Amino acid sequence: MTSLVKPQHYPELFRRYEGNPILTANDWPYPVHTVFNAGACQIGSTTLLLVRVEDRRGHSHLSVARSDDGISNWRIDAQPTFPPDPANYAEEAWGVEDARVTWVADRQEWIIAYTAFSPIGPLVSLASTVDFQSFIRLGPVMPPRG
């Protein structure tokens, strides 16, 4: 039998915050079932999370949470920030999930890669924003597997 041993030649890079989770469904200003992993960025001195939130039907949307220290005193948008739009984007019929946020200096805007989910399966889509209040959907960039 083998045992897992922490290698001694690698320094510890990260330590899990003892107060996790920093956000739960109870923190949301509207009824939700669960909150999941978020895309994160720093805007000035503010930490911004674009959080995957599952509603009580099991469909996901994205919601913005802001904090001055990235740990406490979160200010969460009163309504879903980036809800699915299946009337115009069929690939979002079952929700939008798992955002990743990147500042693109050449464009002077944030690009968001997210999972659009529908009966055809999950696929990667892009959107852009300058303020995390309004968004331009750029559409799918990777088709569903299969």
Locate the predicted segments by residue.
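Beta-rich carbohydrate-recognition and catalytic domains
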Residues: 1-94, 103-146
